[in-house]
Each structure stands twice: as structure tokens, then as C-alpha cells.
């Protein structure tokens, strides 16, 4: 069994360098919610050094609230903003001898695209326009995954180790109780259940079916690195190979 481990980088966390030794894919902030040209260059350089797949992490234009503000923008605006961000990272990667492999939207852009078909289409269209060989990463079973497949893109369905799920397989909004799993044992058990058995227990007790092709590790939690190391160790014990 194989699984991809991804982390969002270039967002101002001190753990970026260590996370790059533990994950197989890096989603690099492109300046709209965090990061800038220099952090993009630095993250790309470290990803190449560690043999980690390089990906763009585009966002709504929302540095004030870290890309977590809901926005209702015209699809053509989202298309242009997404193309702008992923094009910038692709060029930075190429200039350093690397290749951008995937795109994963950030924050509220990710969450809204999981449910809003027009928004999902705009993102998928931008990814396809940049490079049809790019992998589009989105929430398992989401509108974004469906849109990517409609454009003929390779898609990668994502699950979260430390997020609570609703009965329909969507994430519990961060504003609601149960959104974040802070207990390490619970997060580890949830991750193994999703990866090995394709299901997750919702906060209301029902089982939801999920396809787990990549697991997101957040690097900004207090015990993020310790959990990442433990997850890697557990995967090794279960003979689950970590690779992009």
C-alpha cells in the first residue's frame, strides 16, 4: 500500500525544514495568503534537496485573515488569480532546476471549491491551462475532484489527520466544535482508518466513505513534528509506503 503525505509550506512556520524530511509532497504558499517570492524560492530549493514533490498552494487574496475568509468572486477572477499564482511557482521551480508537480488550493478557496461547482471549474481550468500534466489535489469526493476529472487532469483525493468530519464526508468548519483533533491517538487512529479502510467516523457517529490518496499534515500545531514522525513510524510498521 502507498500513500502520499503532504504539508503546506512557506506560511511562516519555523518547522518547514524539518517537515520536508517527513513528507513526500509540499504545497507552497504563492503570496496571496502568505509567503512571497523569496519564501517561494527557499521552499522550492529545500523541496528539491529533500526529493519532495513541489506543488502550488493558491489562495483567495486574503493575507489579513490567512486565506480563511469566504469570498464570492466571479469564476473568471478566480481563474486568473489561480493561474497567476501557479504560474509564478512553476517558473520559480523551473529556474532552480525543479518541476512543479501538483496544485492544492488553500483555506477557504479549498473549502468553497469542495462544494461550489463553478469555483471548482475555474480552478481546474486554470490548472489545465498551466499544464495538463499537473495533479489537482482536493478534498476526497469533492466538486474540485470532479472538476479535475472533467478536464482530464490526474486528481489526488485528500484526507486530514487532524480535522473532524461531518456525516457527508466534508470537514467540520473551523468555527464549529470538533473541527480540530488535538488528541494524537485519535488523529493517528482516524488516519489509519481512512488509509487502510476508506472510511472516517463523523463527529455525529456515522461512518463516511472517503478515498485516501494523500494525507495532509499541518505544520502549525504544537505537536506537529512529533505527530508527523509518529505517523511515518506507524506507516512503516504497517508496511505503508510514503511516496508522491
From Swiss-Prot:
Its EC number is 3.5.2.9. InterPro entries: Glyco_hydro/deAcase_b/a-brl, LamB/YcsF/PxpA-like. The keyword Nuclease does not apply. GO terms for biological process: carbohydrate metabolic process. It catalyses: 5-oxo-L-proline + ATP + 2 H2O = L-glutamate + ADP + phosphate + H(+). Keywords: ATP-binding, Hydrolase, Nucleotide-binding. It comes from the Bacteria. Pfam families: LamB_YcsF (PF03746). It is an enzyme of class 3 (hydrolase). One of its GO terms (molecular function) is ATP binding. Forms a complex composed of PxpA, PxpB and PxpC. NCBIfam families: PRK05406.1-1 (NF003812), PRK05406.1-3 (NF003814), PRK05406.1-4 (NF003815), PRK05406.1-5 (NF003816). Belongs to the LamB/PxpA family. Catalyzes the cleavage of 5-oxoproline to form L-glutamate coupled to the hydrolysis of ATP to ADP and inorganic phosphate. This is 5-oxoprolinase subunit A. It comes from Escherichia coli O139:H28 (strain E24377A / ETEC). The lineage of its organism: Bacteria, Pseudomonadati, Pseudomonadota, Gammaproteobacteria, Enterobacterales. The gene is pxpA.
Amino acid at each position: 500500500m502507498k500513500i502520499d503525505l503532504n504539508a503546506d509550506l512557506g506560511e511562516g512556520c519555523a518547522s518547514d525544514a524539518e517537515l520536508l524530511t517527513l513528507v513526500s509532497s509540499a504545497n507552497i504558499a504563492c503570496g496571496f495568503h502568505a509567503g512571497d517570492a523569496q519564501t517561494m524560492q527557499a521552499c522550492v530549493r529545500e523541496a528539491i534537496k529533500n526529493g519532495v514533490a513541489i506543488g502550488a498552494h493558491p489562495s483567495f487574496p486574503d493575507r489579513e485573515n490567512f486565506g480563511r475568509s469566504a469570498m464570492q468572486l466571479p469564476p473568471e477572477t478566480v481563474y486568473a488569480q489561480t493561474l497567476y499564482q501557479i504560474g509564478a511557482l512553476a517558473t520559480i521551480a523551473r529556474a532552480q532546476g525543479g518541476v512543479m508537480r501538483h496544485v492544492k488550493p488553500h483555506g477557504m478557496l479549498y473549502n468553497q471549491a469542495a462544494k461550489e461547482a463553478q469555483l471548482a471549474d475555474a480552478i481546474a481550468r486554470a490548472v489545465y491551462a498551466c499544464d495538463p500534466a499537473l495533479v489537482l489535489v482536493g478534498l476526497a469526493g469533492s466538486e474540485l475532484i470532479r472538476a479535475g476529472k472533467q478536464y482530464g487532469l490526474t486528481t489526488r483525493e485528500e484526507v486530514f489527520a487532524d480535522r473532524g468530519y461531518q456525516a457527508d464526508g466534508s470537514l467540520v468548519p473551523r468555527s464549529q466544535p470538533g473541527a480540530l483533533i488535538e488528541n494524537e491517538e485519535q488523529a493517528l487512529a482516524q488516519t489509519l482508518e481512512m488509509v487502510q479502510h476508506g472510511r472516517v467516523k463523523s463527529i455525529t457517529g456515522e461512518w463516511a466513505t472517503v478515498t485516501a490518496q494523500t494525507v495532509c499534515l499541518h505544520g502549525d500545531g504544537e505537536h506537529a513534528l512529533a505527530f508527523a514522525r509518529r505517523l511515518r513510524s506507524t506507516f512503516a510498521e504497517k508496511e505503508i509506503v510514503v511516496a508522491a
